[in-house]
Amino acid sequence: RSAGEVSWRLALIVVIGRIVLNESPSDMLAGLVRAFGRDEAEAGALACRILAHRGSIDPRCPAPGFALDGRIFVAPGQLAALSGTDPDLLAALMPHVTVHSGAFGIDPGAATREALLAVPGHSPGLVDHFLARRAMRAAQGEDASVYDMLPPSRYLTASPGEVFTIHAEAVLPGGTVQRVERVVRLTGEPQRPWRTLAWRSQPPRRLPAPR
């Protein structure tokens, strides 16, 4: 880019393609952790801590040793407050979790590879084959449902297309990067077609100097 020019990058993400912290069952939560190469013990432990935070009981989880919190997550970043959470794992999970869709499952038409791998019974080969076919349909402009390309599962659901995350990234002159994220819900009301559910801004950072 030329001196003095500001470059922008925008991304629109369907929220229901993410794992929902307040609704998803323990096997989905653990599956997402395993998608990042963590073992069964670590995946199960984090899933149980998430359930304990929201006051859910799973017979596969050990007794927490404290009163269940019974609180909902209001932002994905609250995962950092759970004891024993690995910061590197937390950073990896953030793009694949949400608190806004309120759905039990995920929409395969919008889900990331990692979210699809969290579904019980989904192997890497199955997911990669599905993603290739999904991309092919999109490239051909086909609007047909993608549900016929995966085995039936109670963890897959249709998206009403009401909640979206908008990512905006600006690279300013001098190499400073500013990122903001807004979560919006479409209302269907002409006077107020959308409303903001969340707004997050990351501290500015500088790009490394070219070598």
Regions found by a protein language model. Give the residues of each.
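Compositionally biased linear targeting/interaction segments
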Residues: 1-211
